[in-house]
Amino acid sequence: MRRNTGLLAMTLSVGLITSGCTHTPDRYYDFTHKIPLFAPTAGDITKPDLSKPFKDSKAVASFGFQATRKVKDPFKTQKGFFQWGWFHFDEHYTTHLDSTDHYLNSDTSKNADKRSIEEYTLKDIIGPIVYIDISARVAKELAKNGGKPSPNPAVTNFSESTGATVLPSDIERVAGQITDRSWIVVHSGWDKHFVGDPPKDPFLHPYINGLNYPGFGKSAVEKLIEIENRKGVRINGIMMDNLSIDSGKSGRGSDGKNPFGDGWYAHQLGLTRGWKLLENAKDTGQLANETGKCTLIAG
């Protein structure tokens, strides 16, 4: 089964195109987290030594390992030498794009788009932004625990029951802006929890929070599909400042317990429609005060 090729070194930039007839962007924003790198442990590139960061690298949330950089012997010339080396990292590390072949349904008739990244055209990765801001609701829920996420939903709960997540009403509110090739960009403010040494159980990193974080649940995904069908359009994808576009609750499936069950609805239902998912975005709030037409360029 083909997996996605993660664009971990991508630049996710947005140019603001002013309203009217001009097509000259006058502002650009970068939504990528840096890729932190660490020296290998005893020369083993598969084992990062977090006590030996490259430059100002700091560990981040990840289901896999932290990235390593192993330096090769210098390539010498008469005037100096070239520095070079190897990198070793998970393809879903930091800001990256999930391609449409990342999730394949067991029912192959549901896999309408099975392309991987090298098969995409510019039309697949560039499109107008539709912006949704849920950060105030997320901050209100975090305030119940002094601004810190708790994996216990009795303390902080990022599901539809509290409203501290993406709701179908959020999608319906921007339905008029959704067109062919749109990018839905969601700002939750959750990225502030991204940096931090991983605990022994990576699921308990504050950013992952025991699969208790804001994002798209099944009803929000279904609302977006309903709007696509109603308008006869197909979006390019979704970008959000969280782990998976899906909410943590979505990842736990219909029984709320099983990450290996029937959940991950943005992946299960969206990727197979041709949506691309830009995960672990940074500082999506940069767009909060923009009133012109914005375009997302993933590359």
Task: Annotate the PLM regions.
Residues 1-8:
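Bacterial N-terminal signal peptides that target proteins for export
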